[in-house]
Amino acid sequence: MKETPLSNCERRFLLRAIEEKKRLDGRQTYDYRNIKISFGTDYGCCIVELGKTRVLGQVSCELVSPKLNRATEGILFFNLELSQMAAPAFEPGRQSDLLVKLNRLLERCLRNSKCIDTESLCVVAGEKVWQIRVDLHLLNHDGNIIDAASIAAIVALCHFRRPDVSVQGDEVTLYTLEERDPVPLSIHHMPICVSFAFFQQGTYLLVDPSEREERVMDGLLVIAMNKHREICTIQSSGGIMLLKDQVLRCSKIAGVKVVEITELIQKALENDQKVRKEGGKFGFVESMANQRITAFKMEKAPIDTSDVEEKAEEIISEAEPPSEVVSKPVLWTPGTAQIGEGIENSWGHLEDSEKEDEDEGGSDEAIILDGMKMDTGVEVSNIGSQDAPIVLSDSEEEEMIILEPDKNPKKIRTQTISATQVKAPSKKPVKKRKKKRAAN
């Protein structure tokens, strides 16, 4: 999958923020991201987190035949893998230019600097030596892979323990971990890589660039150094021309950062060794907290907003005072009102107005059936009452038989009013009825 390029707006935003000495995550120019080191249950297994960049390191060993030109030295082998789990742009099973450059830089930093005593890895000269293999897997990519990989490699080598061996004549005996305690590697110093990103043709400088900052940078300078301020390797990429003063300034900054990282590594190794001796719980399950994958979530970053607050106060002080707030609604014409924030609405009740309209218009259409009696003596005014049921039928007359105790059945004829007969009288008789009422 091809990497998604940055838009022009994002690129201009990043460059403008760098010109103002600001970064997206709130760091200063020379600040490193938080470094966290976790160890597994086996020796030589660790995970290093540099911000959101995560690298897994695993060290293994085996007895092999030495090289012909170096019969008394062991073999060191480094392998870095970039999987699609770290970033979709990485293609599996393909040696990209970035991967080749990172592997070569790791070999120059760790193997060519002689940080590990390879002669101590020899078992029988010219026959058996230890081959130490360091496998590094990038789990998540958020920029500055080389720094995280170098820290993971040196931490895994310091934490690793090889099995103990003994030689009697031509026989080589390999002891298990239960028979003898494993032996740590002989490490002289800890070389650590520190990356510097340059922008605007070397005008601006950032330490530990993130993934987005790497996309807009013009060049990269990597300095590998130990805590004794000895430069192990230095590499510049990007095609920019650096001055001698710039390189010296970067080396001084790298010396300070390397001392801090070395102290962090030694403290993590001591804590792990202490927990293992005391018989406590150790491993990734105990040292790494549960993490949840969330979408549309922004992490809080400590950002200094004092300058923004000062500008806001200046704008408010220079602005004109606000006009007086009207506390009551202004009625411009009858039947109108003003709706605003903090003002109570003064609209009339719609139900009351509707009832008044119904009373005025319904008086003309009222049905007055008082005093009207049918031949049967049943008053029509009782039709709408709840006690007397309304019977709708097409027939004019019906026969009803009433059964009473100790009496003969009686037949009573009642007259029902059909639905077509119950009609509202016209307006003329209603008006006459009103006149009669007025006369009375």
Swiss-Prot record:
SUPFAM superfamilies assigned: Ribonuclease PH domain 2-like, Ribosomal protein S5 domain 2-like
Pfam families (alphabetical): RNase_PH, RNase_PH_C
Keyword Transferase assigned: no
Region feature (Disordered): 341-362, 404-440
Compositionally biased region (Acidic residues): 353-362
One of the protein's GO biological processes: U4 snRNA 3'-end processing
Feature: compositional bias, Basic residues: 425-440
Glycyl lysine isopeptide (Lys-Gly) (interchain with G-Cter in SUMO2) cross-link site: 297
Principal subcellular localization: cytoplasm
Domain of life: Eukaryota
Covalent cross-link Glycyl lysine isopeptide (Lys-Gly) (interchain with G-Cter in SUMO1) as placed by the record, residue numbers: 297
Modified residues (Phosphoserine): 65, 306, 346, 393, 395
Modified residues (N6-acetyllysine): 297
Record function comment: Non-catalytic component of the RNA exosome complex which has 3'->5' exoribonuclease activity and participates in a multitude of cellular RNA processing and degradation events. In the nucleus, the RNA exosome complex is involved in proper maturation of stable RNA species such as rRNA, snRNA and snoRNA, in the elimination of RNA processing by-products and non-coding 'pervasive' transcripts, such as antisense RNA species and promoter-upstream transcripts (PROMPTs), and of mRNAs with processing defects, thereby limiting or excluding their export to the cytoplasm.
Subunit structure and binding partners: Component of the RNA exosome core complex (Exo-9), composed of EXOSC1, EXOSC2, EXOSC3, EXOSC4, EXOSC5, EXOSC6, EXOSC7, EXOSC8 and EXOSC9; within the complex interacts with EXOSC3, EXOSC4, EXOSC5 and DIS3. The catalytically inactive RNA exosome core complex (Exo-9) associates with the catalytic subunit EXOSC10/RRP6. Exo-9 may associate with DIS3 to form the nucleolar exosome complex, or DIS3L to form the cytoplasmic exosome complex.
Protein name, UniProt field: Exosome complex component RRP45
Natural source organism: Bos taurus (Bovine)
Gene expressing this chain: EXOSC9
